[in-house]
C-alpha cells in the first residue's frame, strides 16, 4: 500500500504542480509566445509593405527614367530642327546677299559702261569737230560747237 499511497501522493503533487504551473507559469509563457508571434507577424507585414513600397519606387523610377529619355529625345530633336532651320536661314541670307552683291556689281558695271560711252562720245565728238574744223579750216563759235556736239552725241 505504500506504493499506492506514494503514487497517489505523487499524483496529488503532480496535480498541484500542474495547477500551480497553469496559474502562475503558463500565462506568462503564453503571453511571451503571443508577443513573439505578434512581433513576427508585424515584421512580416512590414517586410511585405516594404516590398510593395520598393516595387512602387522602382516603377516610379522606371517611369521617370522613360520620361527623362523621352524629354531628352525631344530636346535633341528640337535642337536638330533648330540647327537645320538656322542653317537654312544662313543659306538664304548668303544667297540673298550674293544676289544683292551681283545686282550691285551689275549696276556698277552698267554705270561704268555708260560713263565710258559718254566719255567716248565726248572724245569722238571733239575729234570729229577738230577734224571738221581742219577740213573746213574755219573756226566754229562756242554755241554752234556745243550744238554740234549735242547732236553728234545724240546720234552716237
UniProtKB/Swiss-Prot annotation:
It comes from Hahella chejuensis (strain KCTC 2396). GO terms for molecular function: proton-transporting ATP synthase activity, rotational mechanism; proton-transporting ATPase activity, rotational mechanism. The chain crosses the membrane at residues 5-25. It holds the Pfam family ATP-synt_B. It is a single-pass membrane protein. GO terms for cellular component: plasma membrane; proton-transporting ATP synthase complex. This is ATP synthase subunit b. It comes from the Bacteria. F-type ATPases have 2 components, F(1) - the catalytic core - and F(0) - the membrane proton channel. F(1) has five subunits: alpha(3), beta(3), gamma(1), delta(1), epsilon(1). F(0) has three main subunits: a(1), b(2) and c(10-14). The alpha and beta chains form an alternating ring which encloses part of the gamma chain. F(1) is attached to F(0) by a central stalk formed by the gamma and epsilon chains, while a peripheral stalk is formed by the delta and b chains. The keyword Transport applies. Keywords: ATP synthesis, Cell inner membrane, Cell membrane, CF(0), Hydrogen ion transport, Ion transport, Membrane, Transmembrane, Transmembrane helix, Transport. Belongs to the ATPase B chain family. Gene3D superfamilies: F1F0 ATP synthase subunit B, membrane domain (1.20.5.620). F(1)F(0) ATP synthase produces ATP from ADP in the presence of a proton or sodium gradient. F-type ATPases consist of two structural domains, F(1) containing the extramembraneous catalytic core and F(0) containing the membrane proton channel, linked together by a central stalk and a peripheral stalk. During catalysis, ATP synthesis in the catalytic domain of F(1) is coupled via a rotary mechanism of the central stalk subunits to proton translocation. It is found in: Cell inner membrane. The keyword Oxidoreductase does not apply.
Amino acid at each position: 500500500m505504500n506504493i499506492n499511497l506514494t503514487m497517489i501522493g505523487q499524483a496529488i503533487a503532480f496535480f498541484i504542480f500542474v495547477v500551480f504551473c497553469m496559474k502562475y507559469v503558463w500565462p506568462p509563457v503564453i503571453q511571451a509566445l503571443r508577443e513573439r508571434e505578434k512581433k513576427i507577424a508585424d515584421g512580416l507585414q512590414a517586410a511585405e509593405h516594404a516590398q510593395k513600397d520598393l516595387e512602387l519606387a522602382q516603377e516610379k523610377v522606371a517611369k521617370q527614367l522613360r520620361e527623362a529619355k523621352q524629354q531628352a529625345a525631344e530636346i535633341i530633336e528640337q535642337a536638330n530642327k533648330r540647327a537645320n532651320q538656322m542653317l537654312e536661314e544662313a543659306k538664304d541670307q548668303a544667297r540673298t546677299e550674293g544676289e544683292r552683291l551681283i545686282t550691285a556689281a551689275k549696276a556698277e558695271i552698267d554705270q561704268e559702261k555708260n560713263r565710258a560711252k559718254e566719255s567716248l562720245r565726248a572724245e569722238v565728238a571733239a575729234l570729229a569737230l577738230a577734224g571738221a574744223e581742219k577740213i573746213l579750216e574755219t573756226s566754229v563759235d562756242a554755241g554752234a560747237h556745243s550744238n554740234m556736239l549735242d547732236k553728234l552725241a545724240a546720234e552716237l
